[in-house]
């Protein structure tokens, strides 16, 4: 890597950098002394301010003591996914064979390997967040193997998005790793996501010690450097003019002094007037004029190098310009002498990024486009991938070339396979501009919509709608496009529109597999839509459709799952719910093509399957399903929204089983993962609702309210169904806080919603139990009616949990022996239920009501085992103090 002050005064750009050099020395010393935690140095500042020189000092101080790996962003390669992280790890990766690489990376080999270029990608699109996590894990392993290790990244403002995403995640892990990370970037150059990632890195550094903004030289430092370079005879007026001309910019100062020395100028006041003109030759139009003065061959060679940007060899640059070997060598020599290029013939680079930028911008538009086109073909001819050629194809002017469209589509598939959907999106957008042939235009739009699904649901909607408005999609592809469009609409909160979109497409198809798939998706979105117009009619039609189905294919299995979920939410017989779910499985397992990572069917369908088992007291099957989801998503590197949802439902299975501490852990992790994906997403509602419910069971009201505040848990609610019922959970929170009037309003609203949708499952949505207790003091008749209705619905559903909870609710409205008798029956049911927390609640209440210390002690033991702290404390206090007996 070239240094800014190469061939000048080696320490020139390091004047007035004592604080930064001290931080470098201390950080390297700390690493070598074996500190368990990592270090981070971030240097920022304008172009030419000396950041690269400081990074060079890191290498000098570490020489002979540490392993140092370096990488550098490039202005012309920002579109190349994982360019910087591959460059950074190249010393470790280049020597690894496939077997060694697999051993080094372990379980992350299949996920991180393709992104690093050391493993072949699989055939499917991978989750970008999973790839980032895989890279963090992979680099963490390499850190342990190569300690003491220093990672140096220069010009991070030009790093590709994928590498920056990794860098931000890795910087947040440094407290756990013995590695020194050193990053340099310009102030204000990065925008959008790049700026956000660099801000994350900056936040991980400590201002004043490991985060430093470099400033320009003072006049005194400029004078000192001038005399060190040109001799003590440099007079004060000359030194002041050097500072005035360069503004104290270290790079410009060093370059200007080198030119003064090369020109043989006397550093005295009489020659100072020539400094401004001399300085202009090193930048902007002056640099271009200098380049043109070297001749046509040297100019074209510099243009080619600027277009290539990285991995520049004299042979490749000459090939792009059509120069012979001797002419190319002569041009390279001239460019080195003019301090434009540096390095050997196999590793040419520009002396400074400012020069590279100026040269690239000086290339006439037509010539630049032609050079990018030639570079793309050169990359392709060399046997490298379409993805590698794509950065050049992106710069070629559209010209109705079907071959370029095909290359860009291949590149997009390669980008998706390594976890770079943004890069794939850029390729397909450019392919669309070519434009494609009429017969493939709709397909390119479809591919563009699919590429945007994980990163831009709005883009997915626009592109898929455009694709569906055109001819050219195969029938199966068209059906898939409609399903993906509806999924994007749901993720954007437009559930009603998703339902209508599916319905219109299904109506135009003849009976067959595609139509049945659309029907299933239609009912799936209706099933989670809280604002559907005629829920009773939908349930009736779904019941009729599902009745004769045996589960012979995945469309039938999907309809059986939807029917089971509908029956569960409406509180129909739980045995029927379980029987329908079982019919949707193949030998007790998910059918091929209907797995957690299969794309034909949305994973929401499997959430419905697991949720149906969960609320029908078949926690064993729900746990197996969601644990499988968690395992598969982790193995596959799907660590975005899918993994967040899996953690949420694994956590809620623990909640239903009464493992409240474990449940809280999973649910907090779910929210952490969801926060990485975005804000106020449907997954946040589910996970927050489940966590608040769990914390209420534990008796941690303050923590529950913290979650409610952080995730804005309250009205207005989203238009999709939340599991468990959000209004019931919020009503319970309000009651626990003594905010009875607000709780009644919330629970009355839940009552109206249930009446509109005919969803009466007292386990999923126990609003009747809660409302009965809330209104009992002022309206005991209404409370009794609510409790009686809840009991009838619970007996209709038929699970031990539902009936036991209904009996416990009824007991809360009674006194004396009647209450004790009802609690005894509740305990009998809940003892047979898999829900240990509800059993503990009933057992404690029964022990207190019956004044039975043995029963209360059993309740205390159960409460402790569940992690229900407040319930356990209540039982313990009654046993210890003898107060509070029924």
Task: Pin down the residues of each PLM region.
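Helix-coil-helix junctions within alpha-helical repeat/solenoid scaffolds
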Residues: 337, 342-343, 422, 456, ...
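Alpha-helical sensor/transducer elements of the RecA-like P-loop NTPase core
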Residues: 83, 175-241, 245, 252-255, ...
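P-loop NTPase Walker A phosphate-binding motif
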Residues: 46-79, 83-86
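Conserved Walker-type P-loop NTP-binding/catalytic site
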Residues: 2-3, 83-150, 208, 223, ...
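Short secondary-structure boundary elements
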Residues: 221-229, 233-426, 430-433, 545
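Extended alpha-helical scaffolding segments used for macromolecular assembly and cargo binding
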Residues: 40, 54-58, 330-331, 347-350, ...
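Conserved adenine-nucleotide phosphate-binding loops and their immediately adjacent elements
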Residues: 1-27, 110-123, 276, 280-283, ...
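Internal alpha-solenoid helical repeat scaffolds
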Residues: 63-64, 98, 202, 243, ...
